[in-house]
């Protein structure tokens, strides 16, 4: 599967702006500044396809990136305190509206910062994905920021958190070193292949 032929396709700020679901969509979800854009850029080997911002809460739209065989769907980062309640409500309505639609969604990549415990917003999102029956994986970013002992401790911590949720892989990832990149790519390929087989 070719991850390098990719282009920005569309930004939707309202549910009625969402494009038709005519190909599989790999969804990226996570807290503001957790590293969603960096992960997307690393997967497709581009430095600035998805804009990396030092300002949390910058992504206020659902951004669609088109590849040959699937789309990447970048959801607005949640949990940024300095955004107004009205704007938070708009984001929530937009994301809920996206998930409410009958779309081709083989995999949701839920992104968490390995260095820290999941936030209440993270737990709420994972509960939503689990209860909604969405196939999802947890990617633990910024793994290069921890020394070996701390890294292993946090991995065990997250394994314990996810012990009650079946079939959710945990993949440590570093945008700096590329650690975990190949594993995530393979998971995307497998998820799309399995999805296509069930659609036949």
Map each language-model feature to its residues:
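Conserved G1/Walker A P-loop phosphate-binding module
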Residues: 1-82, 198
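Canonical P-loop GTPase G-domain recognition
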Residues: 3-15, 145-200
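Glycine-rich, phosphate-binding/catalytic loops in enzymes
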Residues: 45-46, 88-91, 125-128, 154-157, ...
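Conserved nucleotide-sensing/catalytic segment adjacent to the nucleotide-binding pocket
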Residues: 68-105
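Conserved C-terminal guanine-recognition region of P-loop GTPase G domains, centered on the G4
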Residues: 96-168
């Amino acid at each position: 599967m070719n991850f390098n032929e990719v282009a920005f396709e569309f930004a939707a700020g309202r549910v009625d702006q969402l494009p038709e679901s005519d190909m599989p969509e790999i969804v990226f979800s996570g807290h503001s500044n957790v590293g969603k854009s960096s992960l997307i850029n690393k997967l497709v080997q581009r430095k600035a396809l998805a804009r990396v911002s030092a300002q949390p809460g910058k992504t206020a739209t659902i951004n669609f990136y088109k590849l040959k065989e699937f789309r990447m769907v970048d959801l607005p980062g949640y949990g940024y305190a300095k955004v107004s309640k009205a704007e938070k409500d708009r984001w929530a309505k937009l994301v809920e509206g996206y998930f409410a639609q009958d779309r081709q969604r083989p995999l949701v990549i839920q992104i968490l910062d390995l260095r820290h415990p999941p936030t209440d917003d993270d737990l709420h999102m994972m509960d939503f994905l689990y209860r909604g029956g969405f196939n999802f994986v947890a990617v633990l970013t910024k793994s290069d920021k921890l020394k070996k002992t701390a890294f292993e401790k946090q991995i065990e911590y997250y394994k314990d958190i996810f012990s009650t949720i079946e079939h959710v892989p945990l993949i440590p990832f570093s945008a700096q070193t590329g650690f975990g990149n190949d594993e995530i790519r393979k998971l995307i390929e497998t998820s799309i292949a399995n999805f296509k087989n069930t659609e036949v």
